[in-house]
Amino acid sequence: MCGIVGLFLKDHSLQNQLGQLLSQMLITMSDRGPDSAGVAIYGEPANTESKITIQSDKQNNDFETLESILREKLDERLDISFKDTHAVIRANNTKIKFILELIENYIPTARVMSVGSSIEIYKETGMPSSVIDR
């Protein structure tokens, strides 16, 4: 069964506790069952860059392929970070469509979770506490 938690902080002094506060709220939803859990993380928007967050159950192979393909096909600086079964790609806004096409063509087992200047979405199957720990 689906359950959604959200936290809109009006008190900026709590910003550094956002992850902890949201995690506790999500874990409280555990009694709904081990279906799936996820979080959306918003950062400061970038003017000229966007982020693509992808997820793969075959991350060892997919992410190695992803990094290799992107470095081969793009002629500019690229920032990729890996977080368990997710990868976040930061690139110039003008390259986002091209990167999405590369992902679709070369890494069909990867799923695009989010695209945007400030958002990263992480989603997994399992108990919320397990998802948060990853």
Roles of regions detected by a PLM:
Residues M1-R134:
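N-terminal segments that mediate ammonia production and transfer
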